[in-house]
């Protein structure tokens, strides 16, 4: 029955996009509520010539 196949494909498609959307929302809220990470800039030391 083609109608049932279309409904099944549509429901599977909508379910997959809903799960993807909810996962991204969960990740966003987790990042906002978690402790902020402290990023240190690497201490760039310029190489000194050997003759100095």
UniProtKB/Swiss-Prot annotation:
Q: Which is a GO BP term held by this UniProt record?
A: proton transmembrane transport
Instruction: Kindly state one GO CC term assigned in the UniProt record.
Output: proton-transporting ATP synthase complex
Where do the TM regions start and end?
A: 10-30
Which key words tag this protein in UniProt?
ATP synthesis, CF(0), Hydrogen ion transport, Ion transport, Membrane, Mitochondrion, Transmembrane, Transmembrane helix, Transport
Report the locations given in the UniProt record: Mitochondrion membrane
Q: Reply yes or no: does the keyword Membrane apply.
A: yes
Q: Does the keyword Transport apply?
A: yes
Q: How does it sit in the membrane?
A: Single-pass membrane protein
So what family is this one in? Belongs to the ATPase protein 8 family.
Function of this protein? Subunit 8, of the mitochondrial membrane ATP synthase complex (F(1)F(0) ATP synthase or Complex V) that produces ATP from ADP in the presence of a proton gradient across the membrane which is generated by electron transport complexes of the respiratory chain. ATP synthase complex consist of a soluble F(1) head domain - the catalytic core - and a membrane F(1) domain - the membrane proton channel. These two domains are linked by a central stalk rotating inside the F(1) region and a stationary peripheral stalk.
Assembly, in brief, is: Component of the ATP synthase complex composed at least of ATP5F1A/subunit alpha, ATP5F1B/subunit beta, ATP5MC1/subunit c (homooctomer), MT-ATP6/subunit a, MT-ATP8/subunit 8, ATP5ME/subunit e, ATP5MF/subunit f, ATP5MG/subunit g, ATP5MK/subunit k, ATP5MJ/subunit j, ATP5F1C/subunit gamma, ATP5F1D/subunit delta, ATP5F1E/subunit epsilon, ATP5PF/subunit F6, ATP5PB/subunit b, ATP5PD/subunit d, ATP5PO/subunit OSCP.
Q: What is this protein called?
A: ATP synthase F(0) complex subunit 8
User: Origin organism of this chain?
Assistant: Lycodon semicarinatus
What gene name does this entry carry?
Answer: MT-ATP8
């Amino acid at each position: 029955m083609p109608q049932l196949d279309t409904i099944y494909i549509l429901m599977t498609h909508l379910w997959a996009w809903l799960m993807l959307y909810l996962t991204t929302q969960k990740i966003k809220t987790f990042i906002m509520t978690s402790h902020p990470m402290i990023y240190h800039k690497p201490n760039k030391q310029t190489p000194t010539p050997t003759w100095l």
